[in-house]
């Protein structure tokens, strides 16, 4: 048992990725925690009162540790009105948006969620999109909460460690969903996991976790060999029986292969890897002209919601990583974790 597993009282070196948007609800997260891995709730896009309901439900379903992931607000200024108008004309239903959420309201939401994590004594809290503010870090660490940061480069990982993270998740370019990158890059920033793990493991003193394209025990073993103390997995859990992902999303993952995904900003304004669909193909020429996150995300929300109601995969954000070719079978969390971490795996 390594340091990461000891910190969180785990029997398996696995974190179920906290996938926002209604995918990782208590049924999935508790099933993961009950099998000795770390289940995760995603607070992104959730109102604090709904997060509280999910926390209460988690405590009813499991006595094992779990984590809550929190988006760190980016605090970006509102884009120019002419750019907003242009995108409203190009996104179905975007004209329904009359105003964007004020930055201060996003920070209020962030701190309400931190207070909730403290109040309910949640075992671990992870952060995505930026360095968490120092006051939140201090409060959580004083309360004994294990802190997990997300990084896509060694430099970002070092900053996360310096900020006080107990564990750092290294997100390779293979990973599905939103990139956790938060620093500008001079060159190619989409670093693959095989290059990222050993460099970060050598540079950091805290445990590092590998994320991106891992779907079976071979990927787990490889990550551990390269210096990671655990792995974080999203796509494979997304298609489990217990997942609340849209049935069409699950189906498209089962049908896709590694060449069917790409990084795009079109849905949210922030790079995210998903299965290519008609919306991405039609708007590809505008990839470099999107509004910054979360403004683009707000404008596409109604379109994505309508697409989900209509089972229309062509306008859904079908987040998935590059390891999906062999994800052809829907299984239970228990079955998946046995596949990921058979009894003979050495940790």
Where do the PLM segments sit?
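Active-site entrance/lid segments in N-terminal catalytic domains of soluble metabolic enzymes
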Residues: 1-203
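Conserved active-site-proximal phosphate/metal-binding subdomains
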Residues: 179-183, 187-209, 214-347
């Amino acid at each position: 048992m390594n340091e990461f597993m000891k910190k969180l009282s785990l029997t398996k070196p696995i974190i179920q990725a906290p996938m926002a948007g209604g995918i990782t609800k208590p049924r999935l997260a508790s099933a993961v925690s009950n099998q000795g891995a770390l289940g995760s709730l995603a607070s992104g896009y959730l109102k604090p009162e709904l997060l509280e309901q999910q926390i209460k439900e988690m405590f009813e379903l499991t006595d094992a540790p779990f984590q809550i992931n929190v988006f760190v607000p980016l605090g970006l200024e509102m884009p120019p009105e002419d750019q907003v108008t242009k995108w409203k004309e190009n996104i179905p239903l975007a004209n329904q948006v009359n105003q964007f959420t004020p930055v201060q309201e996003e920070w209020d939401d962030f701190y309400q969620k931190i207070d909730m994590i403290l109040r309910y004594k949640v075992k671990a809290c992870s952060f995505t999109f930026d360095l968490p503010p120092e006051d939140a870090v201090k409060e959580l660490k004083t309360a004994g909460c294990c802190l997990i940061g997300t990084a896509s480069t060694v430099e970002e990982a070092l900053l996360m460690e310096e900020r006080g993270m107990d564990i750092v998740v290294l997100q390779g370019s293979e990973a599905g969903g939103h990139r956790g990158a938060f620093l500008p890059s001079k060159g190619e920033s989409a670093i693959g996991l095989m290059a990222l793990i050993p460099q970060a493991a050598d540079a950091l003193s805290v445990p590092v976790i590998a994320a991106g394209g891992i779907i079976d025990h071979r990927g787990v073993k490889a990550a551990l060999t390269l210096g990671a103390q655990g792995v974080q997995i999203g796509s494979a859990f997304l298609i489990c029986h217990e997942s609340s992902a849209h049935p069409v999303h699950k189906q498209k993952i089962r049908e896709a292969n590694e060449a069917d995904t790409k990084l795009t900003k079109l849905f949210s304004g922030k790079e995210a890897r998903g299965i290519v669909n008609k919306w991405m193909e039609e708007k590809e020429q505008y990839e470099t002209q999107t509004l910054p996150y979360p403004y683009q995300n707000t404008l596409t929300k109604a379109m994505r919601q309508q697409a989900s109601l209509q089972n229309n995969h062509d306008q859904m954000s079908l987040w998935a990583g590059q390891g999906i070719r062999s994800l052809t079978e829907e299984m239970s969390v228990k079955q998946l974790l046995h596949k990921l971490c058979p009894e003979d795996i050495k940790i």
